[in-house]
Amino acid sequence: MGKHSAAEDDASAFIPPDGGGPADPPIRRLAAISLHTSPLAQPGTGDAGGMNVYIEATARRLAARGVEVEIFTRATSSDLPPIVEMVPGVLVRHIVAGPFEGLDKEDLPGQLCSFAAGVMRAEARNAPGHYDLVHSHYWLSGQVGYLAKDRWGVPLVHSAHTLAKVKNAAMAEGDDPEPRGRIIGEEQVVVEADRLIANTAAERAELVGLYGADERLIDVVPPGVDTEVFSPGDRAAARQALGIGPDEKVIVFAGRIQPLKGPDVVVRAVHQLADRYPDQRWRLVIVGGASGAGRRPGHQLHELVDLLGSRDTIDFRPAVPAAELAVIYRAADVVAVPSYNESFGLVAIEAQASGTPVVAAAVGGLTVAVADGVSGSLVNGHDPGRWADALAAVTLDAPRRDRLSVGARQQAAQFSWDATVDGLLRSYRAARDGARVDQGRTGIARIDQIGRIEANGSPLARVAGR
């Protein structure tokens, strides 16, 4: 990235303000679809991660601006009430689709029909025109999103969050390739969506180059960070609260423990650091739970730690709420983000907002989230020796770490959830003003006087149970 800002890098990618005034009708109500994971779930466990944070943070702020948000997600427990008010103006609707437990994310395509029917039934209880638009998150939700678009006669905005073709091009050892069915599903959503949200200009280029998306319909809207939660603090006090000694060299990895996130890279790197610098006290704090392939025998991180004999230097901790995670960031000398792919990398921004430098892989959105040499460093590849070098360069050079800490705070200050919501609202208005209705694709015959789509005996009508 150099010395210029991430905002400057992507400035040309933002769509201009809509210039709306009193005559511009507001967005009243949004249907957000997050099939496979709920914004109420604890990030760092199961399939919950940055997407959960994103949906929760933007929904709160949309509601604060007068936009009602209803989030549809799959129920994962019989104890969950059908509707939960997250905050005033934000409802989470739990849709029963398949068994409550025992389904991995990879099993969920088989529940798309059931989930879509549940969403349609929930909407059918409302007066026509209840939602102004649909925002789907991840490809599974996009499949339901474009059904809702056609059935309700509203525009669809879609956020991919991750892309199968990008993941398959940068697979970690032990990870499974994304199936062709997902790729086809993503291609379908790209065609159907009225607007696509990309976290960075690089993601926009991937959507265009790999999926044939229309660049004119892609809006670059970076995620943000809650600086009221993630802010600098007393490192000594944070360490005391966590039972960490003042003289320890502390490296933090936060996130789901799965091959894609590369936790094994930092485990091996810290093992090398302990060998290189035996007089130093090293501690790697790993915050999060196993997910996906990371739960399988032979791929579990605990097994690698035992194989290396590194139990004395590794501190496993469960996923924690944001306020507690901020304390862990403050206690660290550096936060490591060795992912094989990230569309953005919220952990990197949260850590920097807490005043902690970040050493991250030079991939995807991390090259925007981290300013190389200013707020941390970017590492090419995943060789543990190279990562050990990069981590040592920060942890063992106190003046350099202090400079990077200042740069980290400045870097994070460029990203805010309010700015994210500004971008989303511009995109929503652009989708509403330019929404397309394809007369030949799904048997849609006409749009009636109140703007609802009438499907003359189409499969959509039957799936929707209307």
Curated annotation (Swiss-Prot):
Its EC number is 2.4.1.250. Mg(2+) binds at residues 329-330, 332, 356. Residues 1-27 are annotated as: Disordered. It catalyses: 1D-myo-inositol 3-phosphate + UDP-N-acetyl-alpha-D-glucosamine = 1D-myo-inositol 2-acetamido-2-deoxy-alpha-D-glucopyranoside 3-phosphate + UDP + H(+). Transmembrane segments: none annotated. GO terms for biological process: mycothiol biosynthetic process. InterPro entries: Glyco_trans_1, Glyco_trans_4-like_N, Glycosyltransferase_grp1, Mycothiol_biosynthesis_MshA. Keywords: Glycosyltransferase, Magnesium, Metal-binding, Transferase. 1D-myo-inositol 3-phosphate binds at residues 36, 47-52, 105, 138, 162, 182. It holds the Pfam family Glyco_trans_4_4. The keyword Heme does not apply. UDP-N-acetyl-alpha-D-glucosamine binds at residues 42-43, 50, 256, 261, 320, 342, 350. One of its GO terms (molecular function) is acetylglucosaminyltransferase activity. Belongs to the glycosyltransferase group 1 family. MshA subfamily. Catalyzes the transfer of a N-acetyl-glucosamine moiety to 1D-myo-inositol 3-phosphate to produce 1D-myo-inositol 2-acetamido-2-deoxy-glucopyranoside 3-phosphate in the mycothiol biosynthesis pathway. Homodimer. This is D-inositol 3-phosphate glycosyltransferase. The gene is mshA.
